[in-house]
């Protein structure tokens, strides 16, 4: 095991974040392609709706755990041992994490398969018996994804603790390509838009089995870089002494937040299932666009900073912790506002491009946009609190934010028409995520002091100005170029969406450069430093790139 070189200040974090961002763009483009192919393959069919509902159960668990539970558990437990070069402690902790993960998730997968019918009946409001039966069959095929997700999350955390960032981003790319192939095979067998009755059991199994195969690729491909670390974890339930003291609080935090998010998910799925036939597909598409800028813009910065925050906290280096967190937070705020502006500006063309209800899709995407700010704060601040062991305050904030989603959704879905059911979900999600982000800001200030949030208000103000200006410019452009003889074709809508996104980016960067260039510079500088190094394979002085920065 090679001891990673320590990060040399905020600039190194920005460079690592730029590498992650570049790879994440490719990975998320593949993920977007997967969703686009799925939307075109199933269209507005009842089979597509039941697939979304069934796949949401294990799939959202992955999003939940990867965002804050197991992933947040692994890095803090390993950071100190990795920094100290303690190979034995790293190996023991990794083995214990894998053992506990499989011990908990394998029985859970069995229970999920056994309870597939009642679960789908609970979620599938107003669906026919044939549709519910198809959903239950697919959920049984999806059940093995749970332990596979657990393995992948632990291995991802081990790699990130060693500052190996490349493969955790490459694995989803390979998974998406695998699932795309399954979708194409399905459409070759059943045809586009096939219903439950038309597709038959064989085509249905291609759809569900191919999706689970994608999760196999997602998780087990990470064994390749793990072998390069020369770790040989063995089964066992005992953690190393240093890790043992922290694992309980982190595990409880993960369980509580997962429970809160699952409550929100269950209410969301039931509300969506009670909408129009294609409402689950609209929800799936809108959520994909919502998660795209979050994963490409906010998560890379948070992921790159996480090992530094955990190591600084373990070593008692408060200055490094606060400097790293404040700089990362400012960057995440700016990029989250940029992503929100792009969602608003491009929502209309996106809705017209896909073969679903255009108004419902556009409204849902725009409704998700404000929540991107809170979710971006979640990406960095939850990690910051977990890194310093402040699990109770993190858990309280995250739980309150997620439980606010169904509390807002229930009355909102009753007030809005059935056709706007996904819009109600999007608005409720935004309300909950903004609350979550605000509570995390309060928790971090109490735990680490106001210095950890230095400049956050300035960056938020600049981001808000840039986002409003960029979104208004895009909406003005769309009104200007709108055809007078009806709805534009799908390919015209695609061009309009791309043009809107570019305009939002240009206007946003111009405004932020004028009012807060000091926070924008590190983000842009990190990207400039990283891209030439990756293209040339060498630094400007001729020396090879540093190890431990994600280069495998």
Which residue stretches match the model-derived regions?
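Membrane-embedded alpha-helical bundles of multi-pass transporters/translocases
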Residues: 1-552
